[in-house]
Amino acid sequence: MKRKMSMQEIGRKIKHKVMVLSGKGGVGKSTVSTGLALALAQQGHAVGILDIDITGPNVPKMMGLERKRLHVEQGRIHPAQGHLGVKVISMAFLLENEDTPVVWRGPIKLGAIQQFIGDVEWGELDYLVIDFPPGTSDEPLTVAQSLPEIDGMVIVTTPQDVALLDSRKSITFSESLKVPVLGVVENMSGYTISGKAQPSMEIEIAGPGGKKHKTTADSDGNFNVTLDIFKQGGGKSTAEEFGVPFLGALPFDPGFVRGGDDGVHRIVSEPEGASAIAFAKVVEAIKSQIGASESQGLEII
């Protein structure tokens, strides 16, 4: 009863709750989750990240919070605080070391998730971003049934056909839970090469499969060419097919790999860079969908 009341209190203290899902692993879902949280924090919002990936928690490393320990006071768990003041809760904080596996059966894992929801002292938040393991199993089901007033799900995919197939399952899954789909994000969508040449010089670069990409340098000699590493547009076409919003595309950026390893997210290290700008646009699209639902009473499916 006490935990149930606490969950209801969370519903009042946290204005917006956004679930971030992907049907397939390896699409950069945790990178997107942390990026969304940091982009929101850059805009002045109070933000938290709830890492629900019990067996493979990566969010603390990406947020520069490795080896941190959670503070417990009067039976309440206090989140760690990362870049830009973002609060973080994760199973990683409870492990003896990063090599310790979590070998739990379903009921124990689900109990931990409910504890993360009901026993954490988040304080007042504008946004809680909830990061899940890949797939449509117990974790998102438990959160959807336990956490009140969820604004909706963000589905992360990459342009490959296999990832798109699984993202379609995530959309259908959200409909079965009656949780709105805020939209689809296409990650790793094109790799932009920037360079310097003679002013107005014509540039030709060979991309994957030998495809030629042509552009012309500007009056200062700067040029940009975007290569389709994994092709582009699959996320948008899937969103259109299912009648859900397309929130935007995020570029393939090797800096995310370095940032994830170093614990300094690309948005923090280059707040004016192309990736940070792309995340800001996606965040605005998410806020727009939430605002439309609140002001017009629309049901987003």
Predicted regions: what they are:
Residues 272-287:
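Short, amphipathic alpha-helical "lid/cap" segments that border enzyme active or binding sites
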Residues 262-275:
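C-terminal boundary of histidine-terminating zinc-finger modules
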Residues 1-27, 68, 283, 290, ...:
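Extreme N-terminal, non-catalytic leader segments
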Residues 40, 46-48, 52-99, 103, ...:
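Phosphate-binding loop that captures ATP/GTP phosphates
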Residues 122, 127-244, 249, 257-258:
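Conserved catalytic-core segment of NTP-binding enzymes
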Residues 16-53, 171:
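Walker A/P-loop phosphate-binding motif and the immediately C-terminal alpha-helix
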Residues 14, 25, 51, 59, ...:
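Residue-level signature of catalytic and energy-coupling elements of molecular machines
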Residues 94-143:
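Phosphate-binding/switch loop-helix module in NTP-utilizing enzymes
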